[in-house]
């Protein structure tokens, strides 16, 4: 297992490790470097692939006008001292598959990645992107033993962006003028909060009828599957990478942005010992606080139903891992 022949990354510069050099991981590496946020270590188990991608990205630095170092490696030792570790490794979705269908394969991958990464970067903040997202984040939390403020999953930023995009398309407005938030699990039981969705401060309930809003909510819930069915060879990667880069940026630059992320809850929203999407303030320490919104009875019920589904899959994943360890 060898590292890239590229120049070594300087120890005094921010470093982001991305585990998994697939389409999400490699696109995220590009986003982080071109935003000039940090040097990047791109790690994958396939020899030569992360090294080749890193070289390709390095050759674009002059065009994109940044001087961030990017290395590709198959060795976790090269990730040492990272401020942030992003886990994207895992089997991607295929047509007809739900995110939960990925549970059996990806549980082992994420646990091994988390353990290896924390051994070399014990002070890092972890962001999990692998599906099923909420369960994988919980498993990574268990595997690393990290406090809950230093581990989170990327889901709500992406789901909210999809909801905003569909609202903008429906109304023919600038997407940046639309603000929306999606809570809950990253799947069919997510909870888009239409009451909090606005266009330049105007509630969408003043602009769209109830049937149209419900149609947009359903499209948001199926947003990932819609892309998988169209592409046939994999899932979304541009928007997931962009969503993750927003989280990385808020942490590295200590922006304290309020973003919906998958977080481990300890009583918030009446939920305990589960990872679920909620609004969090992200800064240099990771999750600085969890914001508890006032939810309607229907929204609260939806969030609790979503959490119950995640709990069931956590139990399934733990059984799978226990059986693998005993075999």
From Swiss-Prot:
Residues noted as binding substrate in the record, renumbered to the chain: 93, 99, 131, 162
A Pfam cross-reference name: Ldh_1_C
Matching Gene3D superfamilies: Lactate dehydrogenase/glycoside hydrolase, family 4, C-terminal, NAD(P)-binding Rossmann-like Domain
Family of this protein: Belongs to the LDH/MDH superfamily. MDH type 3 family.
Catalytic site positions: 186
Catalytic activity: (S)-malate + NAD(+) = oxaloacetate + NADH + H(+)
NCBIfam families documented for this protein: MalateDH_bact, PRK06223.1
Position of the signal peptide: none
Membrane-spanning residues: none
Known role: Catalyzes the reversible oxidation of malate to oxaloacetate.
GO biological process: lactate metabolic process; tricarboxylic acid cycle
Organism field: Nostoc punctiforme (strain ATCC 29133 / PCC 73102)
Entry superkingdom: Bacteria
InterPro entries, sorted: L-lactate/malate_DH (IPR001557), Lactate/malate_DH_C (IPR022383), Lactate/malate_DH_N (IPR001236), Lactate_DH/Glyco_Ohase_4_C (IPR015955), Malate_DH_type3 (IPR011275), NAD(P)-bd_dom_sf (IPR036291)
GO MF, one annotated term: L-malate dehydrogenase (NAD+) activity
Positions that bind NAD(+): 20-25, 44, 106, 129-131
Protein known as: Malate dehydrogenase
Keywords assigned by UniProt, alphabetized: NAD, Oxidoreductase, Tricarboxylic acid cycle
Record bears the keyword DNA-binding: no
EC number: 1.1.1.37
